[in-house]
Amino acid sequence: MPELERPTFSVQDLIPLLEENYGLCCTLEELPGERDRNYLAQEKNGETYVLKISNSCETLEFLQVQNDALERSAKLLEPGRIPKIFPHKNGEPLLRVRSGVGSQHWMRLVHYVDGLPMAEYRPHTRDFLLELGRMCGMVTKALHEIPAPPSSHTLLWEMHNVQETLEEYMPWIKDEKLLSWVKTSLDLYSQTMEPLESKLRCGWIHNDFNDYNVLVVPKISVNPDLGLIDFGDMTHSYLVAEAAVACAYAMLDKPDPLEAAVLLIRGFDQHFPLEEKELEILFPMVMMRLCLTLTLGTFQQQNDPENEYLGISQKPARELLERLQEVNPRYAHYLFRDSCNMEAFPGSSEFRNWYKKAEGSFHCLLGEPLNPENTVVLDLSVGSSLSAKMEGVSLEKQVEIMDSYLRENNAEIGVGKYAEARSFYSAKEFLNNSIDGEEKRTIHLGIDVFAPSGTSIYTPIDGVVHQLQDNQSELDYGPTVILRHKI
């Protein structure tokens, strides 16, 4: 990548340039930026613009792609939610200017997009995250159709080169724990990507749906208006990377990061449907964006310690990457598939075919078939008389109540229903953090089988003991055996 030369203009240089080329008399205030110079330009009448001066390495062809992206995105979003180009007096969108040190730069003026950065806006409700996903999907739909071919423009924040970039900049990380997370995440990404790379769709993407580029205008009693700025990191890359970048930032500081990602992906998919292979790589790609943020941020901060903008995402990104180390990638993959109205498990149809062929060959769980003569179906739902008797009493008392109930119904075995709403889950262990606050578990995802102590239990097919554990927390499962079967 060529060495970047940030523009070296002063405010005193730029004010006459604005008046001469745009006919505007403005005050200027510099805005944060990584490679370019950006200024808030304000007229006395209140009209506000952003003056953008590109670094010396930015080509005209790439800036024209950005202009095309701005125009295409503006057609899909609400008016004023995407920067609108303000042409100079000759009618052109770009102006070539020379700095005081003699370097050449392209200058562009756009209308200011109002709003709070998403990082400063709360709450990020379910509806908000869905709407964020919809906007991201609409922008992806607009940009991927840009006919311009991939340019020679190179970018460190490019998912195509993420492995090379991380390997080059990882030596700057002195935090051993962080370094181990980055290496583990990179291994996961490389292994997942290898068989998928040639099958992923590519095109132009915004590539920087971060929480400071998404702007929010709050509204009373309705969803806020969302806008998007800074198309300077556009790149020709995997289309799914757009969703991955947006997810990485939407998941920051969330009580349940995966829920935030699921909501965003659901909204994204409504406007730009994701393919199966893209969903398979999406979670590892989210982790790659976090690794880029942390690795490049470490490097940039050490080389430009006074630029606070370079470190704004470091702390929450580190916390999120640490939390995601505990997430099984397959679990995230299945959640993402479900959010796009696909079967959560890719092998579901294969399993159903196996089950149909094997039906009738399974061994009975308790040694003999369950039937109306020996079995009673239990009602343990909220408000049932049996549920009311069993709530708030000891395990020993619950066993007495269940034994008595089976005798009263002349049954040897009791069966509890799947997906039943229950009020048993009152212990703190059953509280889950969600986007909208704490939620208590209510739905029973399993089938209960109650039988007298000492009853023999059989596996339906051959298997091995995967895990044996006594869960001793209040209202927990008690002794638990998990079996693994191979089919």
What is the predicted function of each stretch?
Residues S10-L18, E145-A148, T165-N207, V217-I220:
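An alpha-helical support segment within catalytic cores of ATP-dependent transferases
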Residues E34-G46, V50, I85, S190-A241:
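Active-site acidic catalytic loop and adjacent metal/ATP-binding pocket
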Residues I53-Q104, Y121, R126-L130:
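A conserved alpha-helical element in kinase catalytic cores
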Residues E120-K177, L200-C202:
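A cross-family kinase active-site recognition segment
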Residues P171-W172, T293-P346:
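ATP/Mg2+ or Mg2+-diphosphate-binding catalytic cores
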Residues L239-P273, M287-P305:
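Active-site activation/catalytic loop segments of kinase-like enzymes and analogous catalytic loops
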Residues N341-D448, P452:
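Polar/charged, compositionally biased leader and regulatory segments
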Residues T459-I487:
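Zn2+-dependent peptidoglycan hydrolase active-site motif and core
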